[in-house]
């Protein structure tokens, strides 16, 4: 896979950052809920994410996108505390999607590939 030359990012200037898809495996787990999603929310609030950035939660748990977003919101509210902003959360939540993927089910990986296919040119980050 070719390396991508990223522009120097200046904090708070999302125009310097490329659009990306973050595929977060284990999205319903403790690490994602306690650390990763609250940290990503903070990056969103500080303006450190490109407008087209997406966060695709992937896990074995059967959830709708709305249920996943509600769990993430509850966790972010706890972790961020008084700095939590409901209007900024709604913006951040619009970036979230969720796919149930069973590691042993080929069809589930095909569904993930289908989700990613329309944005083949963006940076993809797989967090396992």
Model-derived regions: residue spans:
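A structured beta-alpha segment of the ubiquitous adenosine-cofactor-binding alpha/beta core
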Residues: 79-123
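Glycine-rich phosphate-binding loop and adjoining beta1-alpha1-beta2 segment
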Residues: 45-97
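Periplasmic-binding protein-like
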Residues: 126-128
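N-terminal low-complexity, Ser/Thr- and acidic-residue-enriched intrinsically disordered segments
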Residues: 1-67, 113-114, 124
